[in-house]
């Protein structure tokens, strides 16, 4: 497929959110291998920009996200109706999830719980939307694979979409611009009706006839927003040049999944001459071998009238046109023929997951590690001990290419009074390459300077990451504290950008250091397009600064309180001024408690240290803090019903924003340069004496409104205590690491 057309070169450069919703019953089990080979793997290859390979660097950074939802029937009780996998950007890992599905149960049922699966998929897309706030709109695809119609029952397990029927859910999918596709081994009218109801508003015109582009005449394949790697015969000339002359069994590659394949163009006759060097006996033998393979896979004989035409003219003809087999291996995915745009080492960068607990599946990689606040699987404290740090992946089978020192800067672990204080750390490190590779490091400097970048800013650079070579970094644990700090930062939403000075006469100008939490190794990516990569980083940082500036302007216009419940604006302004300032410490992006969002990776200021008071902070004399009161048996004003909005604020305090903010001096890293101070000048309100150090959050100068009596002093401390609420902050990782002071040198 030529670049720019509907092929993998185009799809691989698009950031997509892909959710497969699969029926996990025995009704689908006998057919799944054929569907996987003909449709699912080609679809994954389309989004991945090439065949999934184990060398894909996935799981921590990157663009396209894959997630898997497996639903069952009502006879699976007491088990849950739905199993959900946390999103991953590794296409290879996603394929291992597909291979690990256990198709069991459902034998006595004629329907399946499609509504439960689709409601879970919609919740995943809600999580994707929060994760993608930095890069905006993505290409979203929901693929339903099932072999039974839906129950006439609403969804019950989903919290957000409980009570919605299957038709309601597919209508919501279409209205949100999510491309809905269906793959089934049978032609079920109920499923076709769902596909038609999921049509986006812009595509309400009558569907064109050739929508069913199945490989097998019994299959039903209805797709939107998705094509196979070879496209629909729209460019027969270039396709001819890429067809292998021996024509191995071509059928497994699957049909083109475009909704309306174009008709063959005039230069078709030359393609009929492609197999001219093959005798009729060879063609017949290939057809017989293919039929035997299909029967062995449980698919039955092929549709014989079409097979000779497909063998003679690959890539041309009606919707049953075939693709060459090397585009997709029938077994575990390898990389026999990646597209020209992709390199042998397919590197996939990953955005943080949505925090859903991964379900263990046979054959799936180990999911060791704890879920950090950004949704990234980070090293657990036990893994950060000396034995784990010393046991980095063996590099005995690799060649040493460079040895030197890596230096970076981070905020000191205890909150410093001076916001500009930085701690410089360095570690001896070695760079290793595989045998047979040659990396010219003679001109590399002895010390490499690394700058930290939030991983969320790198999601649009996926194609540049794929077009790069991979090296492995190994750090010695002479300085255990620095090594722990590197693990902590790199495992919680950051990538390292290593700049080579212009004075060094080496070919490499920039190198990206990434940490794989699954493989527990540090990988260095050296993009082949150095200038393009530098320009890409500069562009994403510029865009990030523009977004920050817009948010700052919105806050200055009085829009900083968007996280409060609706209707509380006047109350926050007139009656709880410190609460408004507390809300302004966070960007105006709502974040539900039930989802571990990409808080640590969005590049936004997140006061991760506010859930607990800083060291040395007073434990709150009565009336010391007047933010929204914590839930529990607290003393409220005597007549909260006099103001319904105030009552709503008291009964439903805003989530994690509550707490004591850091001192004014340490708030500088939460504001872009030149921003006005967020906290008002201190007041000595309510006649309370100032005990100990100055109060972190002065009380307001005014008391409650005239219609309410003054708030009685609260006994004990008012600070939040007990268990964490909402996303749990990662101790030790300072939020200032992700702000503009780190990114300035990259502009």
Curated annotation (Swiss-Prot):
Region (Interaction with RARA): 564-653, 640-707
Motif (LXXLL motif): 646-650
BP GO terms, sorted: negative regulation of fibroblast proliferation; negative regulation of transcription by RNA polymerase II; positive regulation of chromatin binding; positive regulation of mediator complex assembly; positive regulation of transcription by RNA polymerase II; positive regulation of transcription elongation by RNA polymerase II; positive regulation of transcription initiation by RNA polymerase II; RNA polymerase II preinitiation complex assembly
Protein name: Mediator of RNA polymerase II transcription subunit 25
Family: Belongs to the Mediator complex subunit 25 family.
Chain intervals with Pro residues compositional bias: 263-272, 326-342, 612-634, 652-664, 673-683, 691-713
Span list, region Interaction with VP16: 389-543
Modified positions (Asymmetric dimethylarginine) in chain numbering: 725
Domain of life, source organism: Eukaryota
Gene3D superfamilies: Mediator complex subunit 25, ACID domain (2.40.290.30)
Region (Disordered): 233-274, 299-390, 548-747
Region (Interaction with the Mediator complex): 1-226
Gene designation per UniProt: MED25
Organism lineage string: Eukaryota, Metazoa, Chordata, Craniata, Vertebrata
Tissue: Ubiquitously expressed. Highest levels in brain, heart, kidney, peripheral leukocytes, placenta, skeletal muscle and spleen.
Region (Interaction with CREBBP): 395-545
Keyword annotations: Activator, Charcot-Marie-Tooth disease, Disease variant, Intellectual disability, Methylation, Neurodegeneration, Neuropathy, Nucleus, Transcription, Transcription regulation
Subcellular location: Nucleus
Stretches with biased composition (Acidic residues): 738-747
One Gene Ontology cellular component: nucleoplasm
Record disease entry: Charcot-Marie-Tooth disease, axonal, type 2B2: A recessive axonal form of Charcot-Marie-Tooth disease, a disorder of the peripheral nervous system, characterized by progressive weakness and atrophy, initially of the peroneal muscles and later of the distal muscles of the arms. Charcot-Marie-Tooth disease is classified in two main groups on the basis of electrophysiologic properties and histopathology: primary peripheral demyelinating neuropathies (designated CMT1 when they are dominantly inherited) and primary peripheral axonal neuropathies (CMT2).
SUPFAM superfamilies: vWA-like
Biased composition (Low complexity): 598-611
